[in-house]
């Protein structure tokens, strides 16, 4: 999953797809969606990153058409760097203006959750906004699993394969088999907890 996030000092709790469409599609200044009106405090990722691609699809703004400041300080390559950038605004009087996107796995680190908070997201056609988790303080991804939270995408794994079409590392092949439903034998054998 992916998050829209702001600084812990912000009073904002949620963002709608319509608001995100305007802020990222028109640009913060032109969108006039308070408090996200200052381009200096709105952060995204490069257009090639899955975070921006997935969120872009959900807000109907293609990743390459986001209106962000065209510099590395606002189109941040790594989610961890983006998290640090937003977290650094803790004592800034403009903390409420901060808005960024990042992977939930980065946001979920306790050091990041202490300095920023995820915004609940209300998708087009929804009546309520949801966090990826059941609440803003849990880590269960309940709303992703039950379909309420749409900001996520599939993950692809790449690995070298031999002429037999199997992964060249046995451990990797075991994981692939387990994920795809192929028969798997674990050594040592284990007893599944959900028989």
Description of each model-found segment:
Residues 1-195:
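Flexible loop/hinge segments at secondary-structure junctions
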């Amino acid at each position: 999953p992916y998050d829209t996030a702001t600084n812990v000092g912000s009073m904002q709790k949620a963002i709608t797809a319509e608001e995100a469409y305007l802020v990222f599609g028109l640009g913060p200044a032109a969108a006039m969606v308070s408090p996200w009106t200052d381009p200096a405090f709105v952060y995204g990722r490069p257009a090639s990153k899955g975070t921006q691609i997935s969120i872009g699809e959900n807000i109907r703004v293609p990743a390459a058409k986001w209106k962000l400041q065209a510099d590395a300080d606002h189109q941040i390559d790594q989610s961890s760097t983006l998290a640090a950038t937003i977290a650094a605004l803790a004592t800034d009087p403009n903390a409420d203006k901060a808005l960024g996107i990042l992977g939930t796995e980065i946001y979920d680190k306790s050091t990041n959750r202490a300095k920023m908070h995820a915004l609940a997201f209300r998708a087009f056609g929804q009546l309520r906004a949801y966090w990826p988790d059941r609440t803003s303080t849990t880590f269960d991804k309940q709303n992703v699993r039950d379909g309420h939270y749409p900001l996520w995408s599939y993950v692809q794994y790449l690995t070298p394969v031999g002429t037999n079409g199997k992964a060249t590392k046995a451990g990797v092949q075991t994981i692939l088999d387990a994920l795809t439903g192929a028969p798997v034998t674990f050594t040592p054998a284990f007893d599944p907890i959900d028989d």
